[in-house]
Amino acid sequence: MLDVALELDDAGRLIYRDVTLSIPRQQGKSTLLLVLWVTRCLLWPDQRVVYTAQSGLDARKKWAGDWLPLLAASPFAGLMTVHRQSGHERVVWANGSRQSLVATTARAGHGDSLDLAVLDEAFAHPDGRIEQALRPAMMTRSQPQFWTVSTAGTPDSSPFLFDKVTRGREIAAAGVTEGVAYFEWAATDDADPGDPATWGSCMPALGITVTAATVQADFESMERHEFERAFLNLWTA
């Protein structure tokens, strides 16, 4: 999907300013986001990239526990300097680009200009205050993107994400090919949740990093609505 989300027009500018990704859990989302922000930092100089998740602590755990070890073992290690001080975590690249973490508050991103903002685990946010805080920081940048990424929640507890998904589906159905990009992997509402064919229809990592045996075991042990939300990316009550 990155080849579409990062598509350029004839002038070499990003076609999409807003990207929403709705996908089941454990389907490669974290790896995709790592590739996204590293690509953005290296493709152009002096980029300002921020990442946040359901909480500042969760964002730091993803950043320090998952992403930094992969980068340290990669060919990119010599191109970056990592700052780990709490509240000032960032990766600074040799070309002047910088990736950092932001708090999950209405003041997130204030005072900075941003090229890419990623709001992960958006189901945990009841409203759009983080987006409202970060969007203005993109106004003066030539190629800004705001990413909203998550597994489904419930309409009552995740109205911000539910609105994003609803509008994204409408935009996709209308055939819009600029401005907003919407990607969703989910089972249909009438699909049999225990059928391996249903799992294969919405779980891109099935058979790669996730086994059918694991999914079967979780299907048998979990509450049905929780399984449908986490594994099939279905909105449940």
Which residue ranges define each predicted feature?
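Phosphate/NTP-binding elements of NTP-utilizing enzymes
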Residues: M1-A237
